[in-house]
Amino acid sequence: NGCVTREDGSFLMIAEEGRPYLIRVSYIGYKTEVQPYHPTPTFHLLPDTQLMQEVTISARRPMIEVGPNGLKANVAGTSLARMGSAAEMLPHLPFVTGRNGEYNVMGCGSPVIYINNKKVRDMTELERIRANEILSAEVITTPGAEYASDVAAVIRLHTIRRRGQGLSGHFNTTYSQGHSANANEYMALNYRTGGLDLFVKGYLAQQNSYGKTTNMNRIKGSAIWQTNKNDVQTHKSQRFSGELGFNYEPDEHHSFGLRYMPETGIGNADRNSSGRTVTRRNDEETDRINFTTAEQIHTGWDHAANAYYAGELGKWNIDFNADYLFKRSHSDQNAINNDDATVQADSRMRSSLYAAKLVVSAPLWNGRFSFGTEETFTNRHDIFTQNGFSADADDHIKQSVYAAFADYSKSIRHWKLNMGIRYEHQQTDYYEKGIKIDAQSPTYNDIIPVLAASWSHNGKSFSLSYRLRKNNPDYSLLTNSIRYRSKYEYSQGNPLLKTQKTHRFSASTSWNWLYFSAYFSRILNMYTNIIMPYKEDTHPGVLLFATQTIPTTHNYGISLNASPKLGYWEPQLNVNMAFLDMNANKIGITERRNQPRFYISLDNNFNLPKGWFFNIEGYLSTASRQGFFVTRTEGQISARLSKSFLNETLNIALTANDILHTGYYHFNLYGINAYMENRIYRDFQRFGLQVSYKFNATKSKYKGTGAGQSEKNRL
């Protein structure tokens, strides 16, 4: 039998008791040592230096490795390391789609992202990490018990551990031109002396977005109302975010640190929409409007802080995190129809969060046992006032979540087994205008089990897993306020939304550079957006966007990934089929269609001589009809060309997104006595330049993982 030691030098081999054994220890650069086994072995290795004239080592690291909870993609030494920033690299991971801070793991949903065990709170942080600093990326499709019950998937990025003392820095500039320009600047400095790290980071971004929408709404009531709308949306903002902190490692067994992260808008953010609507009643035109909607968002300072301790006490590992988060926003909305100011609204939000998490682990029965607790305390207050098109709202939510969890993992020959359980107690207090509403103040007690097993041998692997997931609605949905979208479109929250629960079963297998997975999910109280008429007696022809829950939904899917290497060319093919069996009869929608959706992407990487790298990728998503939702075929092609200089400390890249200008999104939606057609284009076609420079590259050793991430996302 044989094994490789862990980072602390400990190792584990399975053997029968009562028999004599010899242990052989080998380490590169030292002479091999052989000695009889005894319970507390100590090995003294002598240097073994040999002068070699020339050695050439050729090997290919597999891009994908399968584990019991998902898969691991090796980044260092592969084409993934040449994708620019971590944000640009993520969509090139197997079964990961999305961009601009919005990512999706096929068959799972939006992931929680970690960098070196530290949760990513601000997605712009992914722009600041270069892909060539990342050692590996784990895509966890069955999160363990230590993760919150609403975590659908996890992506963990592990950076390359670099040595060095003194001052180090990293600077990055990005510019892209589409319908309007976007730009950002990033600076990071780290000073290391002995076991102390002092670091400061700053990020400045100017964002301009542009979109065009063609829309048709039809409402059936006492009459048939149809509204056709064409509008253009723009959003302009400038933001600054920073990070200041320290990390201290007095020895190899203990470390602690603190970081403070402020963020604010520079001036006001502007969100505008303008266009025309034509409304008909029983095919006779009743209204023609030229409209303009302007919203100003006034942002003060948001504050976040994290403190952590990570240490070893004998065989026990301890990881503790405490978090604080404070956010507030204020927006004014004004709508003008045919030169008349018809709508004025004011929204104010203030929220705070306190969270703590403790994880303790130790070896047990030739495996690993971990347990811990997590607590989050959230306070959010929303005040909405308007000039008569709906009703004012004053919603105040206080929520406390207490969780305890335990997890055990064990390796038996070629098998890896993992089992865990998590208990969560959630108490919500909902107030309207200072009065507690008991019907909207539920208490939940949930047990979340996790089971996973995997087998691997000689390049082949197979895994099975099960997890229960529980989701609470975003706080923005738990409100009674009516939001104005246009004269004939309103939106509303729903404070009566129940908790959504998902039972997910998955299986996967791999061989060499082929990977296949399948999943089945049973979803209870699934959140869904619906459309319906809004108060036909007082607001005829107005469409209301709302959120409801569907009692039972089934979701099926299969995925295939192929990632061979053919000389300079490294292609990666992803094929995914998703089928949603959804019946919305119980919420009043009779439309039910069942047609799967296929997603196909081809990612082509060319590792060229002299530091050149070229990537071109394209995807196609087919039309589908699932439940009351109908989509059309869509796709895009994007490319990247980069060159490294000065021993890879300087990198310059040219990027092109949506080259053929095909990034349109078409969908039709059936509702309660209502129907909608949409054609949407966002400013996806962009051409850009990126310049990145680093010196004396060292990484901060900050090990804080953060707590209460699920509540941060909801806020």
Which role fits each region the language model picked out?
Residues R328, H381, H425-E432, W455-R504, ...:
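Surface-exposed extracellular loop regions of Gram-negative outer-membrane beta-barrel proteins
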Residues L353-K357, V401-A403, Q492, K498, ...:
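Outer membrane beta-barrel strand-and-loop segments of large Gram-negative receptors
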Residues R24-Y30, T40-S79, R99-N100, C108, ...:
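Short, acidic, small-residue-rich periplasmic hinge/interaction motif at the N-terminus
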Residues T40-L46, A86-M89, M123-T124, E138-V139, ...:
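N-terminal periplasmic accessory domains that precede
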Residues I14, H92, K118-G144:
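Short acidic/polar hinge/loop motifs at secondary-structure boundaries
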Residues Q296, H396-Q399, A439-P442, K470-L524, ...:
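Outer-membrane beta-barrel signature, preferentially recognizing the C-terminal barrel domain
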Residues R239-G267, I289-K433, W455-S461, L514-S517, ...:
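Face-selective signature of the C-terminal outer-membrane beta-barrel domain
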Residues N1-S10:
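Short, acidic Ser/Thr/Gly-rich low-complexity loop/linker segments typical of extracellular
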